[in-house]
Amino acid sequence: MQVISFFSAKGGTGKSTFNMLLASYLKYVLGKRVMVLDLDAPGYNLSSTREREADGMLQENPSFDANSLYPIRKIEDLTRSHIKVEIADLRNLEEDYDYVVIDCPGSLVQTDASFQMLAAGVFTLIVIPMDIDGMGIASSYSLGEVCKSLGQPFLLFFNKVYWQEKKELYAQFESFFADGGMRVSSHRVKNSVKLRRDADGTAAYMRSSVCFPMKEIKATVPEIIELFEEVLAYAGRRDTG
């Protein structure tokens, strides 16, 4: 079983969107057994999206089977003692799931659930989305340093990329991270308003926990699929190596 999380200690990087899309890609495209743990208090974005989508599906089709969806567990008790219980329970799920995707709170201090899970070695891979600004670069580098100190495998990638920005600038930052022993994916995800919209009954969405909108993704941000394939291949190597 592989445990993956798109995670950033800086808000607004799109981590929850990528966690949702990865889980949907694994379940609805690859046919994998997937569970999502939602620890992202107080908003619990993934849980609220699932509730809204499931209600909509039932209204459209009363015979809809919610068991056909991957489960999203909302973890409301984020105390240190309970997170220890969650970590122990997680290690007992290997027979039931191929992947567990965890959406963590967007902060990293030693009292956080995120840090506790990192320190416990829960994750097969941490994937760090980053913006090309000073604060985003600094935050991502600091998180990479924490992962390195804990022996946690991780992969960085650029999100919200504007193609008119100079490619040389991205290359410079990639070299900066490489000098620090940090791997940056070559798959840069371009900026898209649609990527920030939940399913709303129209074609103008990319975020969904009840399907993977392959047509819309391929038409707008096909690099997401390439990124996911890289993430899964890298996690697979770490899991077996």
Give the role of each language-model region:
Residues 102-103, 126-131, 156-160:
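Conserved beta-strand segments of the P-loop GTPase G domain that flank and frequently precede/overlap
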Residues 32-34, 100, 126, 153-154, ...:
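Hydrophobic anchor at the start of a short beta-strand
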Residues 111-134:
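Inter-motif core of Ras-like GTPase G domains
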Residues 205-241:
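NTP-binding/hydrolysis catalytic cores, primarily Walker-type P-loop NTPases
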Residues 1-7:
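Extreme N-terminal, non-catalytic leader segments
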Residues 137-151, 156:
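Conserved C-terminal guanine-recognition region of P-loop GTPase G domains, centered on the G4
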Residues 162-213:
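Beta-strand-loop-alpha "switch" segments that mediate conformational coupling across diverse proteins
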Residues 7-13, 20-22, 27-102, 106-112:
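P-loop/Walker-type NTP enzyme "switch/lid" segment
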